[in-house]
């Protein structure tokens, strides 16, 4: 979230997973309890940042609508909402990346939760796409992220044909079907 009159510079991005590990290590508690504390502290920091008119960002799977109220509060306080939405084009790839993360010491997530979160993230994205002032959407399925879509105000620009889940989120956000024309035709 960025105050409308600010320029974008350094933005504190809160990563819940890294914060939970830090809490677990420094407060000598299990990771499950540390995750809960991280979520509670992040929510408090985000609202405190809005109250202090301080730009802040948060990384989220977007599998719940919990940040909607924060966005509404920030907008009511003059913030411009900027969103980066990064997805993988298939939940199988999400499952594989979690396996790799676990193999390198990261935390596990049950496969059924990964798959359910993939679907819910697109469902929730529709609301944030509609409400955000600026949105950049990237597909991170390959070796390099690819920009798929941008939104500036009410204008959407597609750089590639969206996957069905993204197309449905856009349709849900704006209430109409998309027609895609290849730019090379």
Give each language-model segment a name:
Residues 10, 78-80, 131-132:
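A generic structural signal for alpha->beta connector loops
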């Amino acid at each position: 979230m960025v105050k409308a009159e600010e320029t974008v510079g350094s933005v504190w991005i809160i990563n819940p997973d890294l914060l939970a590990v830090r809490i677990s290590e420094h407060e000598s508690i299990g990771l499950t309890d540390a995750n809960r504390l991280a979520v509670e502290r992040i929510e408090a920091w985000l609202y405190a940042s809005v109250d202090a008119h301080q730009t802040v960002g948060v990384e989220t799977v977007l599998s719940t609508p919990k940040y909607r109220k924060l966005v509404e509060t920030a907008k009511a306080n003059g913030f411009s909402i900027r969103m980066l939405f990064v997805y993988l084009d298939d939940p199988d790839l999400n499952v594989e990346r979690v396996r790799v993360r676990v193999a390198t010491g990261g935390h596990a997530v049950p496969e059924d939760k990964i798959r359910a979160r993939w679907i819910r993230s697109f469902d929730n994205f529709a609301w944030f796409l509609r409400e955000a002032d600026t949105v950049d959407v990237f597909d991170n399925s390959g070796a390099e992220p690819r920009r798929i879509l941008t939104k500036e105000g009410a204008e959407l620009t597609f750089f590639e044909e969206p996957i069905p889940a993204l197309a449905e989120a856009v349709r849900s956000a704006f209430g109409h079907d998309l027609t895609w024309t290849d730019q090379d035709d």
